[in-house]
C-alpha cells in the first residue's frame, strides 16, 4: 500500500478487520468490511431451540480473527442466559476430539466462526452433532453448504455493489478518506438454512 502512493485512491472490499489490516485513518483509502454479524448469528440458537442452555465455540487458535469472533459470541450468549464452552484447534486433525469435548460438556449448540481451518472440515463437526441433535450455527454461507445448519451471512454480491458505489463517488471527486469504511446493514444479510442438515439432526427450523 505504501508503494502505491498517496495520489492514487485505494478502495478495498471484503476485509474483515480493516483497522487490524492498517487500512483506517488514511486519506486515500476507503472500502467495505465483511465482518460477520456474530451477535445476530448467535441469536439464531434460541430461534431454533428456545430451551438451549449452553453454547460451544470451536475455532483455530492460530487465527486472531476467530478469537475476536469467539469473544463476541460469548458476550452475546451471556446476554441470552446461556453458559459457554470453548475448544481451540491447530489443525483439522484436532476437530473430532474438540467437538466431542464440547458434546461432553453439555453444549446444546456449537458456533463455528469464519475460520479457515474449520471451514475445510465442517462435515467432521456435523458427523458428530447431527446424531445428537446439536445446533450448528456458522459464520458464513459456505459453511452451511458443507453441512452447517443456519447462518446470517454476508451477501458478497451486495457488498461488491456497495464497494463499486464508493468507487463512483471517488471518480466523481469525493476524497476516498472522506468516505466511511462500512459493511452491509443487517437488513441486507442473507438468512441461510440447510434443510438437509436440519432433517439429519431432526431439528425443526
Q: What do these predicted regions represent?
A:
Residues 31-80, 180-197:
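An alpha-beta-alpha
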Residues 4-38, 139-150:
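Flexible loop/hinge segments that line or gate small-molecule binding clefts
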Residues 11, 55-58, 107-118, 136-139:
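Periplasmic-binding protein-like
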Residues 96-106:
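Short, well-structured alpha-helical segments in soluble
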Residues 18-24, 30-53, 155-174:
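Hydrophobic alpha-helical segments within soluble ligand-binding/sensing domains
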Residues 32-39, 59-69, 86-97, 116, ...:
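Hinge/beta->alpha junction and helix N-cap segments in small-molecule ligand-binding domains
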Amino acid at each position: 500500500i505504501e508503494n502505491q502512493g498517496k495520489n492514487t485512491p485505494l478502495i478495498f472490499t471484503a476485509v474483515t478487520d480493516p483497522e487490524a489490516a492498517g487500512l483506517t485513518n488514511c486519506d486515500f483509502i476507503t472500502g467495505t468490511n465483511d465482518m460477520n454479524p456474530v451477535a445476530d448469528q448467535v441469536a439464531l440458537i434460541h430461534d431454533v431451540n428456545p430451551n438451549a442452555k449452553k453454547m460451544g465455540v470451536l475455532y483455530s487458535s492460530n487465527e486472531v480473527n476467530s478469537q475476536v469472533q469467539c469473544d463476541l459470541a460469548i458476550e452475546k450468549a451471556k446476554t441470552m442466559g446461556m453458559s459457554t464452552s470453548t475448544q481451540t484447534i491447530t489443525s483439522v486433525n484436532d476437530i473430532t476430539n474438540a467437538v466431542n469435548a464440547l458434546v461432553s460438556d453439555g453444549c446444546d449448540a456449537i458456533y463455528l466462526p469464519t475460520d479457515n481451518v474449520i471451514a475445510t472440515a465442517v462435515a467432521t463437526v456435523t458427523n458428530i452433532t447431527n446424531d445428537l441433535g446439536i445446533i450448528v450455527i456458522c459464520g458464513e454461507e459456505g459453511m452451511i453448504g458443507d453441512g452447517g445448519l443456519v447462518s446470517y451471512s454476508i451477501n458478497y454480491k451486495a457488498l461488491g455493489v456497495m464497494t463499486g458505489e464508493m468507487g463512483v463517488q471517488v471518480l466523481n471527486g469525493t476524497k476516498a478518506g472522506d468516505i466511511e469504511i462500512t459493511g452491509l446493514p443487517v437488513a441486507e444479510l442473507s438468512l441461510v438454512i440447510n434443510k438437509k442438515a436440519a432433517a439429519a439432526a431432526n431439528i425443526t427450523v
